[in-house]
Amino acid sequence: MIRSELLSYERPGRERQRVQLVRWDDWASLRFLRPGVGADALRETAQIYRRFLIPAAPWVFGQLLLFALPEGGEAELRAAAETLRRGLRLRGGEPRFSDKKTRALWETLSRAGCVELVRGRLPFLRVLPVRSSTGLLSESEPDARLRVNASFFIFDPFDCATRYDTVGTPFGLAVEDGEVLSPPLCGREALFVYRDGRVRVETPTLEDLTVRIGDKAFRPGRDGAVYARPGYRKTPRGRGFDHVIVGRTLVDVVRGGGCPVPASGFVLRLAEQTGEPGGAVAYGGMEGLLFGVQAGNSLVRGGAPTEGFVSRFWNVREPWRTPFPPSLYPLDYEKARAARIALGADAAGKPLLLWAEGAAKIGHRPGEDSCGASLSEFAAICRDVGMVEGVNLDGGGSAQILLDGKRALQISDRRDDGSEQERAVPLGLMVK
């Protein structure tokens, strides 16, 4: 049985905050949801850039070419991005090509409606490939009683740090019934639900896993060196073969080091090449978990609200200074307000899900609409409703809860007419 209630909190300056609290009885019913291919994912992503991201910080962005493929997989998408980066320039907003291959690709994409150009103030071009395997939660798994967005995913130019990163790639640990769907990254906290009923916030690492490539299994850090962000932008030069892994795919093998470290994955250096690019990767080591999801920061641990950043984030104002993990964050734990999603457990170990409604990015009415919550404010709310262990999931414009197909609150991204503009996401959670 799923139970929902709406709560309201008064804030200084006559602001208010609305929160949806959802409870149900068992973790076994919680599953990951993959929205699948969304026909409008490219267009909707470009609209988010045009309406919200670039107007908020136009001095950060140059010209952005977002594109998808009408057909083909991840390898083909990355190859197309490399072709466009090498052979395409924009002059006066018009494309110029250095070779016939690039021109042919551009014409194919243009005819299929798979190109979107958005403009910031800086004089450079960034090519951003967009995965087609993203979609709208509202159009996915319509029979599910509960749907909510989940972990972070690659979304902006800083996230697309290497040729291996594509917009719409989910990242961070995801475990379902002992199976690792994606590995842990970036030293961020995760919510672990053990088969024996324990629920805890922990910080998993790649060294906790075994990595299987083909028929061989390796322990990162013992059988081979592991390189990930924010520790490394490139692997050091040296002997061996760098195996570039994103999710459950071996995307490249580079000999001798100097390999870019993806924001959405990691590099495992082995003495010999194992497997071929495009091959499958599997993980072991989490068989004792019923469920696990990594995003961070924690909100409540041991019944006490978290008082500052524990998970590793990077300040959006200076992303170029060091190798940075994805999901750049405004590092003000106390004051930076936004829409938030929390997942955790009460004292009996039963699930709690909260959505703090964000301020509308267009047409916000102070005192009438929600103002959004800082992580500090949200942690206090989570503790007050009885959460004893819990983490923050992806928030902002992605934040929403659908219960029996309906939203009790509103998404913070809005169109000019005030209607909600839902973001396409690659991963969610559901209870059927």
Regions found by a protein language model. Give the residues of each.
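Gly/Ser/Thr/Pro-rich low-complexity, intrinsically disordered segments
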Residues: M1-K432
